[in-house]
Amino acid sequence: AELLELTILTHGDCNFRCKYCYEKFENIAMSTETEDAIVQFLKEKLQSGKYKYLSVGWFGGEPLLGYKTIKRLSPVFIDLCEKYQIHYQSAITTNRYLLTKNKFRYLNEKFKVTSYQITLDGDEESHNNQRVLQNGGLSYNRIFDNLKAMQESKFDFICVIRFNVSKDNYQNVKEFLTHDGIYFKDDSRFKISYHNIGNWGKGDRDINYCVTLLDKDASFELSKLAVTSGYHISSP
């Protein structure tokens, strides 16, 4: 009861068109009127004295398409929490494609975003097959380079690398642990999470269900393999 959790969808669109995605996207950014309404709602909640913690989750679509909203609202949230002596924390679920080194620094230092969930669907081949850019382009190398820049920083954060697992990329996901994954293996800020791709809904793409679903839950087996290989695992 002392925790107020707020999930904010900064933008209705996404720069990816993943083959298994369930969302229907609209190219709509958050209006200043909606931002003002969120601030007013938050003021009323925080000044009630009921809360000691505020947790904000930035979501989408792709939330970094609405980076201006994060940039405008975060300082207001932080100031309100300081005023009412409330602990503030913030998280973002992002595909990481737009998260440049500069934006990451701002999110971490200025806006107190210290928790990140980023998806890599195996190695370069399998990821680029499942997680396609809106324009049909490839995404793995840029995301991986951005993740490496994150790892090379000195900031405090937790980054969950999520793998959506299908029959098509199962082997590639396993091989990530002995190839590209070694960059993050000894860094406790990075944690791995596995999820079977399910029948999540058609979304708005004809290419939906171009992946073959697994007939078993692979998350436990893959998590066990990651732990025995020396990786840190995210709690469910």
What are these model-derived regions, one by one?
Residues 1-102, 110, 114:
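Conserved alpha-helical substructure of the radical SAM core
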Residues 22-24, 34, 107, 131-134, ...:
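"Short basic amphipathic alpha-helical interaction patches in structured regions
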Residues 37-40, 68, 72-79, 102-106, ...:
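Alpha-helical scaffolding segments of alpha/beta enzyme cores, especially the outer helices
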Residues 54, 124-125:
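Short, conserved phosphate-binding/catalytic loop or strand-edge motifs used
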Residues 56-58, 92, 118, 161, ...:
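Buried hydrophobic side chains on well-structured beta-strands
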Residues 61, 95, 121, 164, ...:
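Cofactor-binding loop segments of dinucleotide-utilizing enzymes, especially the Rossmann-like FAD-
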Residues 104, 108, 112-124, 189-197:
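Non-cysteine beta-strand/loop elements that form the S-adenosyl-L-methionine
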Residues 125, 129-236:
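Radical SAM enzyme [4Fe-4S]-AdoMet core and its adjacent flexible, acidic
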